Structures are given as C-alpha cells and as structure tokens.
C-alpha cells in the first residue's frame, strides 16, 4: 500500500490522539492551578503560625551524624559510562552507599520522593551479609548530579541511569528493590531490560501505565495524587515546599497518621539536609514534570519474579492498585502482601516485616 494512503488512513487516529492529549493537558493544568491555591494556603498558614522561620528554608551547613554512620556502608561516586559503542552514556556522577561487596549478588535500591539513599538504612544493615547492597541517590538528588532542564528527566534517561549503574558496578544483573518513584522506574526497567533484573522487590509503587488506567476509573486516586498536579508548574512548587523551613516536607515525614513512626530529629534532618541546599528541590520535582508527556501509556505484561509489599493505610496509593497490578502479571510471577497497619513508608516503618518477606522470597538465590 502506498505510503501516502497509509498516512491518510492514520490521520484521523493521530488527530484524535492529539486532541485527547490536548484535553488531558488542559485538565492537568487546571488541576495544577487548584492545587497551587490549596498548597499556597497551607504554606502561608505555616508561615503565619511560625513567623520566626520566615518564608524561606534554612540551608543546613553540615549533614547530620546519621548520614555518616559507617555501619551503613561506604560512600562512593560512580560516573555513568557504557562499554558498548556507539551507545552514549550520560556522563553523570551518581552518589551511592555500598556494603557487603563480594558477599553475593548485587542488590540495588531505588528510593522515592522526597527521600534519598538513607531511606534504605535498615535494609543496608540487614542484607549486607549475603548481598552486595547498593543504595543510590538517583539523578537530581544531591549529592548526585542534578541537571536543571526538565528534558533531562525523561523515563528513557532515568532507565539508562539504572542500566549504566548495574553495568558500571561490574554486574550483569541485580535484585532490584524499590519504593515510590523508584518503584515506578523499576517496573519500567523490568520491561525494557529484563535480562538485567533477576528479582524485584517493590514497596508501595505502581507501574505508570497501571496507575494511569486505574485513576481514570477511581477518582479517589486522583485526589490522593494531588501534589503531582502542583509539580507541573515552574518554580512555585520549590518555593512552597521550602517555606517555613520546609514545613510541608517535615509534615510529610512526621505526620501523626501518615508519617514515619519513630523518625528521630536526626533522621528527619538526613532528608532535609540535601533538599535545603540551593536549587536542590528542582531535580526531584522535574521527575513529575515529565509524568504526563507520554499520555496515554499502553499497559504491558509484567513477567519478572516480583515481591510486592503494600501498606494497608498508604495515603498516596489506594489498596485497589495491588489487584490492578496483578492483572498485568504473567501468572505465577507475582507474590503480593498487604501489610496491616502500615502506610506508605514500609522500608522505614515496618522493616522487620519487609525483611522476613524478602528473605523468604530470595531464599533460593542464597545457595
């Protein structure tokens, strides 16, 4: 069939897709304006209640001691390169914490937002006796390199970072452990680079295509994801999150109902320290500024053997997503558990339960 005929036949579908994307983006930016108003009110309330803090965040001049805890591992930097031309590497430098080198397979940890490598402190201690555990600060999260441009945070580039990290550490595959944003990337990585992932452990994070499909039919999930709409706007999210010395971020971690139980002041500072440095909120928020670029996403079959752990009281993701994820799996490849009483922060709030499930799931790899 002549090319011009094919083009003509596809034209209505392409036009419909463009119109759909235009409609979606219009609704997204409308929701962004509403979210901006709500979060502005919240931030201003914090300022009025704590006037001495002012409208800006206080830069932390030195990291808390817990970030230098030697029992968690050695602090290293990896410059991302690939050894197979003509593929180009990003050349970015990523910070990571490593322990247990030579003790077994690579166990690579991917954190969520607003977190960093320190989110995996319990798992680094637990598994370093049998695995080479590596918790990375992902692109955009200081002290890893943080390009300012939104285009530097596309899914393709973020997946390349994971691939280059595995290869750069000298491995051909890994056990990929992830949470929140790290989980969203891990799902995609397992689809596009299945040979590099031996097993996956996911805590509270759905595949992007699944949450897109789920949210269309469950408006409650859209309300839970309200912050994503705010993050579509330039500069304002960074300003609001930093007001009253990062009170919105503090509340995220320490909220009586939805926060991390037992989080100490020093551990809270472990997360705030890097975010308090000039410009260090922009990289993490740029992840969200790319979320709607590829709408609509086509769901794909998931086949990597996966342990999925979900908090019963997760404030960010509805429990129904667990069943939705299961529908996209090859039968027999997914083991899922809902942890009673737990929320969004399972690796930090319920490490013992997580470790028990992980040891059982990985038992056959221990030899």
UniProtKB/Swiss-Prot annotation:
Inhibited by 1-(1-acetylpiperidin-4-yl)-3-(4-(trifl uoromethoxy)phenyl)urea (TPAU), 1-cyclohexyl-3-dodecylurea (CDU), 12-(3-adamantan-1-yl-ureido)-dodecanoic acid (AUDA), 1-((3S, 5S, 7S)-adamantan-1-yl)-3-(5-(2-(2-ethoxyethoxy) ethoxy)pentyl)urea (AEPU) and to a lesser extent by 8-(3-((3S, 5S, 7S)-adamantan-1-yl)ureido) octanoic acid (AUOA). Its main location: membrane. It catalyses: an epoxide + H2O = an ethanediol; 9,10-epoxyoctadecanoate + H2O = 9,10-dihydroxyoctadecanoate; 9,10-epoxy-(12Z)-octadecenoate + H2O = 9,10-dihydroxy-(12Z)-octadecenoate; 8,9-epoxy-(5Z,11Z,14Z)-eicosatrienoate + H2O = 8,9-dihydroxy-(5Z,11Z,14Z)-eicosatrienoate. Keywords: Endoplasmic reticulum, Hydrolase, Lipid metabolism, Membrane, Microsome, Transmembrane, Transmembrane helix. One of its GO terms (molecular function) is epoxide hydrolase activity. SUPFAM superfamilies: alpha/beta-Hydrolases. InterPro entries: AB_hydrolase_1 (IPR000073), AB_hydrolase_fold (IPR029058), Epox_hydrolase-like (IPR000639). It is an enzyme of class 3 (hydrolase). Disruption phenotype: No visible phenotype. Mice are born at the expected Mendelian rate. No defect in the metabolism of epoxygenated fatty acid epoxide. One of its GO terms (biological process) is lipid metabolic process. The active site is at residues 180, 288, 344. The chain crosses the membrane at residues 22-42. It is a single-pass membrane protein. The keyword Nucleus does not apply. Belongs to the AB hydrolase superfamily. Epoxide hydrolase family. Catalyzes the hydrolysis of epoxide-containing fatty acids. Active in vitro against epoxyeicosatrienoic acids (EETs) including 8,9-EET, 9,10-EET, 11,12-EET and 14,15-EET and leukotoxin. This is Epoxide hydrolase 3. The gene is Ephx3.
